[in-house]
Amino acid sequence: YFVFSYICFTFCMVQAINAQVSISAGTGFLRGFQSEKSFFGIHGGLELPRNNDVTLYGRVGQYFAQNEDQASTALVTAQDFTTVPYQLQVNYFSSFNYTTLEGGTRYYIGNDYDSGFSGYGGSNFMLAFNTVKRDYEKTDITGMYEWEGQYQTGGNEETEGRIISFALGLQGGLKYTFPGTGTVYFDISAQYAIAGVGNNETANNTNLYSPLYFIFNVGFRKDLY
């Protein structure tokens, strides 16, 4: 809801101060350096021309959750001291996703921003929000004991955690504008998180997070006048 409201507000402000603005939407995937998974998702954005060859842009991306390939193990403890066994080992899989907010400047080479074929590139910044969730198995590692309701995880074994990071990067792409219709585009971004923090041990212990990641996007842009 926050992201949707932010886009609507930004769109209205841009319309109020400039006669031309572009909206875009598409799909793509994100891949962390040395990460075992690719995250597929969707994106939407706005682009505001400063002149025929230079624009400012903003984009929101949602890259859907993936699970770790290997299970991890946590220790759960009985809520009643008389329960036997008093502690159990339980396997779990962690899932991980990305929500991204990015903005930056694009410089077009070849034809103009709103005509023909051209390349573009520039620098950007990005805020990334990750949610880490643990899916615990219903029984312990032996398969003999159901633990939910009688046992509890430790204080540092929360079922959900979050990571917030700030990244700087570069983007390059190609686009072709069909007169009177719109623009198709493809771009690649390389981002490096210069600052990031997890709110608990669940967030900090995932192996799907990488400070260096690449985003590949394809989509359609419509110019509004």
Residue ranges and their predicted role:
Residues 48-146, 166, 178-181, 217, ...:
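Gram-negative (and chloroplast) outer-membrane scaffold detector with strong preference
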Residues 20-27, 78-87, 146-155, 194-199:
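Flexible, solvent-exposed coil segments and beta strand-coil junctions
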